[in-house]
Amino acid sequence: MANRIKKGDQVVVNAGKDKGKQGEIVRVDGDRVVVANVNIVKRHTKPNPQAGVAGGVVEREASIHISNVNVLNPASGKGERVGFKVLEDGRKLRVFRSSGEALDA
């Protein structure tokens, strides 16, 4: 099944501790996505002198389930659901379900 959300999309988080935050999709991993500056967690890292990595506490983005984000509609400024429309030539086009407006060019 094709993903309704792709890398580079502007999204709004609709559930969880970061509800309402907006950001850009950095990575899509199956049914999980990483959103820039959202769901920040602390990770403790060991020092690795061979790689030149200092140890300590590092903050980074953790993944969020894909069902907890909606694509931001620039026209309305809200997060909306995305569906697919099949064109006459057989191509699939992502569209907003509320307005039918196309996401992809």
From Swiss-Prot:
GO biological process: translation
One cellular component (GO) term of this entry: ribosome
InterPro entries, per the entry: KOW, Rib_uL2_dom2, Ribosomal_uL24, Ribosomal_uL24_KOW, Translation_prot_SH3-like_sf
Molecular function GO terms recorded: rRNA binding; structural constituent of ribosome
Pfam families (UniProt xref): KOW (PF00467), ribosomal_L24 (PF17136)
Keywords recorded for this protein, A-Z: Ribonucleoprotein, Ribosomal protein, RNA-binding, rRNA-binding
Keyword Translocase listed: no
Described purpose of this protein according to its UniProt entry: One of two assembly initiator proteins, it binds directly to the 5'-end of the 23S rRNA, where it nucleates assembly of the 50S subunit. One of the proteins that surrounds the polypeptide exit tunnel on the outside of the subunit.
Subunit details: Part of the 50S ribosomal subunit.
Family the UniProt entry places it in: Belongs to the universal ribosomal protein uL24 family.
Protein name (Swiss-Prot/TrEMBL): Large ribosomal subunit protein uL24
Chain's gene name: rplX
